[in-house]
Structures are given as structure tokens and as C-alpha cells.
Amino acid sequence: MSEHTLGVHSETGILRQVIVCRPGLAHRRLTPSNCDALLFDDVFWVKQAQKDHDVFVSLMRARGVEVLDVNQLLAETLDIAEARSWILDHRISWNHIGVGMVSDLRAWMDELPGHVLAEFLIGGLQVNDLPFDPSGLFGNHLGPYGFILPPLPNFLFTRDNSSWIYGGVTLNPMYWAARKPETLLTAAIYQFHPKFSGKVEVLWGDPLKDHALATLEGGDIMPIGNRTVLVGMGERSSPQAIGQLANALFEHGTVDRVVACQIPKSRAAMHLDTVFTFCGGNVVTAFTEVADQMVCYDLRPGAGGKHLTFNQDPRPMFDVVAEALGYQSLTVIPTGGDTPAEREREQWNDGNNVLALSPGVVIGYDRNDDTNAALESAGIEVLKVPGAELGRGRGGGRCMSCPTIRDAI
């Protein structure tokens, strides 16, 4: 592990360590008939997506970032007997597998090498992968190519299932059922893997509990510094969860202020970071057609640390964020393009979803020519990743990364 302590203390301070997930079996199992249910807009050319993801990783490593891949982390975690039992106890159950096949399936999975089991847990397990005939009502219902465990292609977007907020982490209850198992697997890595075991403070969230309507995803969470966290409240992160998150952060003494930004519920603006990200200093990039409509709510601890104080802030979001960080104003680089149609296209292709490696250095997709040019004109160095394949899941550099160690600014 890096010599630095786990924790993410800003959006643009030097990035020291990050978790990613290279495309693999889960993406080879995307089809035109199932990609919608698995939250992808299209199927991948997987071999090219892997090459492009390797470019993404290489750019980070070239700047000194320690890059960890969840495929390897999970494989190593599964080589620990206690961890394997914990994961399979919760993943291979009557509720998931049905009555009649749990014993045979569990006995087989207990003997698999860690890297093979990890590939099935992320990539999905089909009936034709089994060395035995499926049994029970569920097993016979599936047919020869049915999924016993559905694939998790959205694990590519490691940002969402957990969020490091200053010195601790949240284990996020995801909005869609297709993504909920990601949080369980990440929780196991944090609990059992030697890089994390005994070093992680969980601030909120538990993948073993039913959070009902309290859903939260990391694309909406930004620890911006100055003991403040910005949280998007839209399609994926609910006010029920954000209130609980604020309570937990205040009780742990993690922050003094939570700013909740209400965003339209739409596929194009599924998370705050699809329309707004930080680039360094007071420079941000934003899809202003959406960002200008956001309403901000200020949450702070109540008297004696009890309950929450809650106020709607009448100011535009950019002014709220500038004040929280001690700036007179933000320099906003809008989505590039001369027409509304061009700007909408570049936002759809994750033009505003950049990952800062350090102040003034970001990673973005190469396809967003106008937005990248605008950022470069503002003095931001843009390291470009091919985005034709990776962008089919609607996520850019920030979405494809879960920072675990980042400096303050």
C-alpha cells in the first residue's frame, strides 16, 4: 500500500491511490437483449474497451498514482478462507439461488481458485458454466444459458458502490438491483484484503441491510475540502439517504457541512459528476443547461449535535460552492460546442466527467473535442483516453475510478 493514510480530502488534490475495474467477462456477456436491464446503452467491443482502459490506467500510473484493480483485489480476497465464506454465505443463498441448488453450487464454488471465482462473481455465472446439471425449480427454470448470478458490467464504474469522504468510507446502497451486489463485494475487500483490513472506518451503509428508499451512489458525492461535502440529489441518490449520510458524517466529526444539490432525474444527468466536476483551484467544468437549474440545500449539525439544521440556499450552485471553498467565484468551463445540440452531445459523451490527478491535470475522453479545447484554453492539462467504447455505459474518467487516497488542497 502507499505510505499515505487512506482518505480522500479533496476533489483535485494529488491522487495517490485509486481502484478501477478493467472490462472483462461481464462485458462479453452484454447483449442487445440484456444491456438495457444491465444499465448499458449498447454492447461493448470488449477487446478495444480493454485496450482503452489500459490507456486510462497507464496515464494514471505515469503520474505516480497507485492503481488497484478490483478484479485482482477480489481474487486475492477470495483466497482468504474467512472472506470467501463471508461472500458466499451472502451471495449463494435461497433468496438468490432458490431452493434445491445451493448445496451443490456452494460446494463447487468453495473449491474454485480465487481468480476463477472472482471472474464469475463479477462476470456472472451461467448454467453452461457449471460442471453439473442444475437442480431445483430455479435451476431448471433458467434454460441452458440462463444466469444463476447476473453479470456486473457496471463494476467498471467503481466510483459508485463506495465513497471515501475525508478519513472514512460509505458502503453505498445502490439505486438499481443490477448494481447492488457490487457493494457487497467491495465491502468484503475493505474488510478482509490486507491492503485495507483494519484500516477502514465505515461511516455509513451496510450491504447486508435493506435500505429501502435510502439510495446513494458515489457519482453524487464530492468531498470538496474545507470540511464540506457536496452531494447530488437526483435519480440515484435520495433525500432519505442524504439525510442519514449527513447525520453519520456529523456524528463521526467528519464534516461541518453537507450541501445537497437537487438535479433533474434523467439518464443524461444520473449523477452530479455527469454535469459538474472540479479541475483545479477554482476551475470547474459544467453542463450549465442543467447546473444552472440546480437548487442547493445546506445541512449542518443541530444544537448539541442533535438532528439537522436544514435551509434552502437561494443562490446559484456555483456561488454556493465558491463560498464553501473560500473563493469569490468559480471559473466555469461550460460543455464545449457552438450550438445546444453540440453541447448536449458532448455532455452525453461524458465531456464534464473528468478525473483530476492533481490541480490542473485531468483525464477525459478524447471524443469531446470542444470541451477539451475549452479546458486547455483555461490552462487545464487534459490527458485523453479513447472513449468510443468505454463511454457506452455512460461514464467517464471520474466514474471509472474510486480514489482511496487523495491529498487535501
Swiss-Prot record:
Pathway noted in the entry: Amino-acid degradation; L-arginine degradation via ADI pathway; carbamoyl phosphate from L-arginine: step 1/2
GO molecular function: arginine deiminase activity
InterPro entries xrefs: Arg_deiminase (IPR003876)
Keywords: Arginine metabolism, Cytoplasm, Hydrolase
EC number: 3.5.3.6
Catalyses which reaction(s): L-arginine + H2O = L-citrulline + NH4(+)
Compartments (UniProt record): Cytoplasm
Keyword Cytoplasm: yes
Gene3D superfamilies in UniProt: Arginine deiminase, L-arginine/glycine Amidinotransferase, Chain A
Active-site positions on this chain: C399 (amidino-cysteine intermediate)
GO cellular component: cytoplasm
Any one GO biological process: arginine catabolic process to ornithine
HAMAP family xrefs: Arg_deiminase (MF_00242)
PANTHER family documented for this protein: ARGININE DEIMINASE
Family assignment from sequence similarity: Belongs to the arginine deiminase family.
Protein name: Arginine deiminase
Source organism (scientific name): Tolumonas auensis (strain DSM 9187 / NBRC 110442 / TA 4)
